[in-house]
Structure formats: structure tokens, C-alpha cells
Amino acid sequence: MGAWCRAHGISSLYIAHTIEDQAETFLLRLARGSGLDGLSAMQAIAPFPLAGFDELKLERPLLNVSRSSLRNVLKNAGLDWLEDPMNDDPRFSRVKIRQGWPQLEALGLTPARIADAANHLGRARQALEEATA
């Protein structure tokens, strides 16, 4: 993807990550024992170092939007979208988290609350970086 963006002069790659993706990423990193950097929220705009050139940015404008809200907007606009088949493959930990949302939500662990926690940690990380710069 990075090479394609570079070849076509594209400086921003937009990703449709939603609030559920933010929460799932937090839980996956928590399970791995990540520290502050890992538990901090995905940034809305971030460098894409895997692309092989510094100019490409990942932009995630939908991090505060639920997956169901996004789908409703697309349906109402008569637009189709593509589903990654890996999103339903139970071999992946992210899919197991998705299957467990009803149990987590019963405990008050909603995607929005988990994403809020990740955002708080992101602000804490930023404050530490600024204080030690």
C-alpha cells in the first residue's frame, strides 16, 4: 500500500478504523502486557513507517464512530463496502474479542469506555513526552 501511495503522489492513507477497532487494539495490547505506549490510543493522524517513506501519514477520521453507525450511514447513502474475510476468522484474537463483546459490555466494558481509557493513556503519554523533552 505504501509503495502504491508513493507512486501515485498520495501523502495520506485514510483508514476506516472505528471506535470498536480502537477498543480491540487496546485489549489486544493489554493481553500482551504492553506499557503506556502500547496502551495509548491509535492516533487519528500518525506516520506510516512501514510505507518506507516519511511523507505518508495514516489518517483515521472515524475513531470516534461506531461500526454500526458507519454501516447505517453507508446503507442510507446507498453505498457498499468491503468486508475483510479475516474479520470473521475465529483464528484471530481480534475476532475472539468481537465475539466476546456481549459479555464485556455486560460488565460495563463497552467499546466507547475502553476507547476513552486508551485516549486518556494517550494524553498521559503525550504529557510525559512533553515534560521530558
Where are these regions (language model features)?
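Flexible helical/loop "lid" subdomain adjacent to adenine-nucleotide binding pockets
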Residues: R6, S11-S12, T18-A133
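Short, well-structured alpha-helical segments in soluble
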Residues: M1-C5
